[in-house]
Amino acid sequence: MTQAVMLQGTASDVGKSVLAAGLCRIFYQDGLRTAPFKSQNMALNSGITPDGKEMGRAQIFQAEAAGITPDVRMNPVLLKPTSDRQAQVVLMGKVATNMDAVSYHDYKPRLREQILAVYNSLAQEYDVIVLEGAGSPAEINLRDRDIVNMGMAEMAQCPVILVADIDRGGVFAAIYGTLALLHKQERDRVKGVIINKFRGDVALLYSGIEQIESLTGVPVLGVMPWLDVDLEDEDGVALQNDKYRGNAPRDITIAIVQLPHISNFTDFNALAAQPDVRIRYIRRPEALTDADLVILPGSKNTLSDLAWLRESGMADAVLQTHRQGVPVMGICGGYQMLGDTIVDEVESGLGTQPGLGLLNAITRFAQDKTTTQVNATMSGELPGWLAAAAGLPVRGYEIHMGETVLQEGCCTAMTLQKNGCSVADGAVTADGLAFGTYLHGLFDSDAFTRAVVNGLRARKGLTPWETTFCYAEHKARQFDLLAEAMRQHIDIDKIYTIMQQHQEPV
């Protein structure tokens, strides 16, 4: 008998993903084989499974919290917005098509059978499934074809816990309004509420909790405080939070350009965790003034974001910063932008466009998407701030639909091992001031990250740090801290009871 519980929210970014990861960690600590599941995820942060399938980063870090290898079945449908009106539809880890919102809404009913089959296959292998909804179940305009909130809860026949964010204000109205907009059979599935992100004396909430419980008949299972834990965020909404403003004084400042279609900003979590590094996401040219390194991150619409760089003045600012001797790095879409030319007949239909010209390279987009985990070795000789990283092993993953060919004056940055073959990747200039790669997750390689940060320290006349920060151990500690806080502030025994009362045979 498989047990399951689903976290749904009163809105986006209320903390569902993190609390789901915390439940995965708790059940893992308690000896239960646990898997996360989100039927449909809309995010530009994605990752690659060991078998080369693309899935949402949220379910990847939830799987890590549960002590298991990420499996694409944990996120069978991934939507990656390419513009305000279109998204790339990824089914079971592979690109299916591009659709606008109306077309996808009409298409969703066809996915129900596949989603349920995938869910049931997971349920046969695990003791507990922790499901996560998307946005809010009270989107009444989408109810009839829902496959991710109450529609998924109905398919899985599982109880629901509603998560509400008190930090944004109006928490009791959000709880009451969400429950009021549900149909009775949907409301009956909601067995508890968690109030999340509270700051202050919880005693001030007691009278409100009593009233909301009386009004709705749904118990509040706990009040989670605002936690100082370093865990991944699912989407770009999180870039507006204090966590990414980077005001704390540190020896090294790294400026990451916040592109309109930024993807995989989880690439920089390991950098942000370094004790001597401050990262800042920037959108204004003047914010580049104190940067020791500028990074152009991944993008889901490379040419559109390149046009934004020029229109906003950021392109000129990046080039001026580079002329002043500050290194500029690009990852995936950012790497493509650093080149001389981009030929795109696939993603944007804009044809041939000039890049920023910092790397003598030409990128041509293709229909087929490369999705693979890889081991790599940095080139044996690297210039400037990258010198200490020469020859180091690194790991990462590729998600791209283009091929970049180097021209005269560019050297290969690293060699990938793919299907038993050595494949060149990335580019670096002779002075090391421009460096690009397709490899996401590069900074999760501890020795590489410490080497390049020490290279930046040396440029400022600072003593290198001899101690290497272990990011994997750091993440494990964060999962344990989250689980400890949830055990302290949430009635976990009640959640066990809720699951046991509603467990279903698979």
From Swiss-Prot:
Membership in a protein family: Belongs to the CobB/CobQ family. CobQ subfamily.
Annotated ranges, domain GATase cobBQ-type: 251-448
Pfam families assigned to the protein according to its UniProt record, in alphabetical order: CbiA, GATase_3
Name recorded for this polypeptide: Cobyric acid synthase
SUPFAM superfamilies: Class I glutamine amidotransferase-like, P-loop containing nucleoside triphosphate hydrolases
NCBIfam families: cobQ, PRK00784.1
Matching InterPro entries: Class_I_gatase-like, CobQ/CobB/MinD/ParA_Nub-bd_dom, CobQ_GATase1, CobQ_N, CobQ_synth, GATase_3, P-loop_NTPase
Organism: Salmonella agona (strain SL483)
CDD domains: CobQ_N (cd05389), GATase1_CobQ (cd01750)
